[in-house]
């Protein structure tokens, strides 16, 4: 029973987050293009790309400031950056959101 209390504490502290997963092949083509650019180190389409993602929504696992970076996924027909992003962690993990950080899916290769 102690392990359950410890597990609950980790979840409450944000150290563990439950995020759905998706395969690269299931992403929209624009997200796959953005992922390719991230892995190549750019060039990026928007000046905000590569900036720190602060995880204020606490949807992703809690990490130190600067751990996550965000990148815009082009939204066809949008006049601005739209709501779609890929967030990259320093550990090599990638997350996709299509609703401006409300939900994420971890991208699996």
Q: Each PLM stretch: what is its role?
A:
Residues 3, 18, 22-24, 101, ...:
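Extended, aromatic/histidine-rich regions of cofactor-dependent oxidoreductases associated
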Residues 42-109:
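Functional cores of ribonucleases/endoribonucleases
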Residues 8-13, 27-30, 71:
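Generic signature of intrinsically disordered, low-complexity, basic-rich segments
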């Amino acid at each position: 029973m102690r392990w359950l209390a410890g597990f609950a504490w980790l979840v409450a502290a944000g150290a563990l987050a439950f995020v759905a997963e998706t395969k690269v092949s299931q992403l929209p083509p624009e997200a796959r293009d953005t992922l390719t650019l991230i892995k190549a180190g750019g060039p990026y389409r928007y000046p905000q790309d590569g900036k720190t993602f602060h995880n204020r929504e606490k949807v992703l696992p809690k990490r130190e400031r600067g751990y996550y970076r965000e990148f815009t996924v082009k939204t066809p027909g949008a006049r601005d950056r739209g709501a779609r992003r890929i967030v990259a962690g320093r550990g090599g993990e990638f997350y996709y959101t299509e609703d401006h950080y409300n939900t994420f899916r971890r991208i699996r290769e």
